[in-house]
Curated annotation (Swiss-Prot):
Substrate binds at residues 83, 89, 121, 152. The lineage of its organism: Bacteria, Pseudomonadati, Pseudomonadota, Alphaproteobacteria, Hyphomicrobiales. GO terms for biological process: lactate metabolic process; tricarboxylic acid cycle. It comes from Bartonella tribocorum (strain CIP 105476 / IBS 506). Disulfide bonds: none annotated. Gene3D superfamilies: Lactate dehydrogenase/glycoside hydrolase, family 4, C-terminal (3.90.110.10), NAD(P)-binding Rossmann-like Domain (3.40.50.720). This is Malate dehydrogenase.
């Protein structure tokens, strides 16, 4: 059987971690691409040399030319500048938009049939621009955000309730930024909703509100502690879970930055919503009922994303 090919555009901390996790899971052969000569080759070799110890059979190689991604089944994009302490994701828009233009052209030429996962910030605007630049079908281009934000929310809740993260479910909608919308009503511990757990005395609404804010600040918290970089383990794990759902056709119900064409009353915008993710890419966008408070927060988040997309158009008018 021919193994799947997974191309990683960007070989920084997330790219290297992606390659390692993909190797351990034996999801496919890996091409690490980066414009920095030697970096992708060195990381590919280092990970490959760990394979006899960890017992995985995956071919890894590094490259500095887009030709190397030719025919890739999955492309995961991390290329661009990462946040530093004190920066918001939105501060990266100008420089990373130029990167997306180059990456989109490379994907369009060499991997037009791939399923593309974008991680580059500001996420929702960058995946929107990447889809435009690449010309790939909207259901084959997604952004990694909701899974990561939901994972952070789930972890913080598991710590609050002192239970296994496996028994905590959570949904975070909207843009991947300060306006993200953690949905308390749809978040559960062992099937019991958070509002019911508050009524049962397991926690207080004040604590839930604090956890929601910590979730919104999750990336910034990691950055402030690291001081010299941004999160990479959790973002990489999130993206690999998306790639795995596509490659194995598992039809996972997960929150991703997906293209909306009327769903939730939103058009021509990528924003975090629950979807069915399978071998067809985004096979279905799930529209859940939102109460007025949730709807207002979601609309506010969508408008924040739209403003970023408008800023992209101001820089590159052809995106319109």
């Amino acid at each position: 059987m021919v193994r799947k090919k997974i191309a990683l555009i960007g070989s920084g901390m997330i790219g290297g971690t992606l390659a390692h996790i993909i190797g351990l899971k034996e999801l496919g052969d890996v091409v690490l691409f980066d414009i920095s000569e030697g970096m992708p080759q060195g990381k590919a070799l280092d990970i490959a040399e760990s394979s006899p110890i960890d017992g995985f059979d995956v071919h890894l190689k590094g490259a500095n030319a887009y030709e190397a991604i030719e025919g890739a089944d999955v492309v995961i994009v991390t290329a661009g500048v990462a946040r530093k302490p004190g920066m918001s994701r939105d501060d990266l828009l100008g420089i990373n938009l130029k990167v997306m233009e180059q990456v989109g052209a490379g994907i369009k030429k060499y991997a037009p049939s791939a399923f593309v996962i974008c991680i580059t910030n500001p996420l929702d605007a960058m995946v929107w621009a990447l889809q435009k630049f690449s010309g790939l079908p909207v259901h084959k281009v997604v952004g990694m955000a909701g899974i990561l934000d939901s994972a952070r929310f789930r972890y913080f809740l598991s710590e609050e309730f002192k239970v296994s993260v496996k028994d905590v479910t959570a949904f975070v909608l909207g843009g991947h930024g300060d306006s993200m919308v953690p949905l308390v009503r749809y978040s559960t511990v062992g099937g019991i909703s958070l509002p019911d757990l508050v009524k049962m005395g397991w926690t207080t609404q004040e604590r839930i509100d604090q956890i929601i804010q910590r979730t919104r600040d999750g990336g910034a918290e990691v950055i402030s502690l690291l001081k010299t970089g941004s999160a990479y383990y959790a973002p990489a794990a999130s993206a690999v879970s998306m790639a795995e759902a596509y490659l194995k056709g598992t039809k996972r119900v997960v929150p991703v930055a997906a293209y909306l064409s009327g769903e939730y009353g939103v058009n021509d915008t990528y924003v975090g919503v629950p979807v069915v993710l399978g071998s067809g890419g985004v096979e279905r966008v799930i529209e859940i009922d939102l109460d007025k408070e949730e709807r207002d927060a979601f609309d506010y988040s969508v408008n924040a994303v739209k403003k970023l997309c408008e800023a992209c158009i101001a820089l590159v008018p052809s995106l319109k």
